[in-house]
């Protein structure tokens, strides 16, 4: 109600660079695997509104430049398109697949790397600063305690999905620059190869790129 009555206050705070996001509320939802849970960070109504506005603008500018092999968190894209990539690769003789697993992807996004990538195209420092504030927003636990955060982009808000695609588009472009075929849905990705030896080389080199260039962590136990 306050937002509706005083929209100018919110606008002026954003323009002046004085807007401060509230802590996100941590909650858990069960995963398909029994006993496993996914942590979400739920923003306030006002923060969700601001995040959604930022996400819409980012999507407008970035989405047209994304790889055609990226299918998650995008308008007019769906999981079935990733399946079509797999079928098409199989038809063309690709019999080996590197299944890359990024360990706790959303929870481990490096803030400095994210800001660096955004700054390549966004020249308004106020926008970069506001996004950085959302990335660093405190986390309120169920017991009322508040935790500081120096990495990660909490799932549960409208901004994290587009930021994830902006970051991982660097990976898409690297794979394509090497002449490789792949398909990605959010942080789930497969790379297609024609021989076992090629798959092993690709797995090693792409793992190195992910960890050294994007500062993410590959789960070696699940990557195969």
What kind of feature is each model-predicted range?
Residues 35-40, 63-66, 97:
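Short small-residue beta-strand/loop micro-motif enriched in glycine and branched aliphatics
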Residues 40-57, 64:
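Hydrophobic alpha-helical hairpins/lids featuring a short glycine-rich hinge
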Residues 21-37, 42-43, 47:
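Conserved beta-strand/loop block within the catalytic cores
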Residues 34, 59-63, 140:
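Short connector loops/turns at beta-strand edges and beta->alpha or beta->beta junctions
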Residues 6-9, 13-28, 65-69, 73-77, ...:
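Conserved polymerase palm-domain catalytic core
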């Amino acid at each position: 109600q306050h937002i509706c009555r005083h929209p100018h206050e919110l606008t002026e705070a954003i323009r002046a660079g004085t807007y401060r996001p509230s802590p996100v509320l941590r909650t858990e939802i069960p995963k398909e695997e029994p006993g496993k849970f996914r942590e979400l960070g739920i923003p306030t109504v006002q923060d969700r509104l601001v995040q959604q506005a930022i996400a819409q603008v980012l999507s407008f500018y970035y989405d047209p430049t994304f790889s055609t092999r990226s299918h998650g968190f995008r308008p007019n894209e769906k999981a079935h398109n990733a399946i079509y990539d797999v079928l098409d690769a199989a038809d063309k003789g690709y019999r080996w697949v590197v299944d890359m697993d990024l360990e706790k992807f959303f929870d481990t996004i490096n803030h400095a790397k994210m800001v660096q990538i955004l700054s390549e195209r966004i020249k308004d420092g106020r926008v970069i600063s506001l996004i950085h504030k959302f990335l660093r927003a405190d986390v309120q636990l169920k017991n009322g305690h508040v935790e500081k955060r120096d990495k990660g982009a909490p799932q549960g808000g409208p901004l994290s999905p587009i930021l994830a695609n902006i970051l991982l588009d660097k990976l898409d472009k690297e794979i394509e620059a090497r002449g490789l075929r792949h398909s990605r849905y959010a942080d789930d990705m497969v790379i297609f190869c024609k021989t076992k030896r090629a798959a092993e080389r690709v797995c090693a080199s792409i793992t190195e790129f992910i960890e050294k260039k994007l500062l993410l962590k590959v789960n070696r136990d699940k990557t195969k």
